[in-house]
């Protein structure tokens, strides 16, 4: 299926898209269940993800499809796609190529952990940088 020339499939209508035609997406490492990242998809991105078995998101800032790893090489091979009980969040179970999902060079975008109390806490980076971002993006 080429989503650029054909009508999008009817199964996409089951997803509860927001007013902007987007749905939140969580990418999870299939082998470890680590939560890697959060992003958005539109209908075309979800259809392309199913078609190619590689994660394709929608970039709200660039207003275009974002093929994960198109610049960094850190693609996500999709093993499974799930829809939550309210049909308004998508979960991708992926294999993260190179182990780096975050643009900061870390395994996960969720590398900051809150430590402390409501009166005196802060966010602390608890996961290491695996590769300097300046060497990832050229």
Swiss-Prot record:
Reported cofactor(s): Mg(2+); Zn(2+)
GO cellular component, one term: cytoplasm
UniProt-listed Enzyme Commission number(s): 3.5.4.19
Pathway(s) annotated for this protein in UniProt: Amino-acid biosynthesis; L-histidine biosynthesis; L-histidine from 5-phospho-alpha-D-ribose 1-diphosphate: step 3/9
Domain of life assignment: Bacteria
Binding-site positions, Zn(2+): 85, 102, 109
Keywords of this entry: Amino-acid biosynthesis, Cytoplasm, Histidine biosynthesis, Hydrolase, Magnesium, Metal-binding, Zinc
Family: Belongs to the PRA-CH family.
HAMAP family: HisI
Function: Catalyzes the hydrolysis of the adenine ring of phosphoribosyl-AMP.
Quaternary structure annotation from Swiss-Prot or TrEMBL: Homodimer.
The name this protein goes by in its record: Phosphoribosyl-AMP cyclohydrolase
Upper lineage: Bacteria, Pseudomonadati, Pseudomonadota, Betaproteobacteria, Burkholderiales
Gene name per UniProt: hisI
């Amino acid at each position: 299926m080429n989503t650029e020339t054909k009508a999008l499939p009817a199964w996409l209508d089951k997803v509860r898209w927001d007013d902007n035609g987007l749905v939140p997406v969580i990418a999870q490492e299939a082998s470890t269940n680590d939560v890697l990242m959060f992003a958005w998809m539109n209908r075309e991105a979800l259809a392309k993800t199913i078609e190619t078995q590689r994660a394709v998101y929608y970039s709200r800032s660039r207003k275009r499809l974002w093929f994960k790893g198109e610049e960094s090489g850190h693609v996500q091979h999709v093993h499974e796609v799930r829809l939550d009980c309210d049909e308004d969040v998508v979960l991708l179970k992926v294999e993260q190529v190179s182990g780096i999902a975050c643009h900061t060079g870390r395994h996960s975008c969720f590398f900051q952990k809150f430590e402390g109390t409501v009166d005196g806490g802060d966010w602390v980076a608890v996961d290491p940088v695996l590769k300097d971002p300046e060497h990832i993006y050229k």
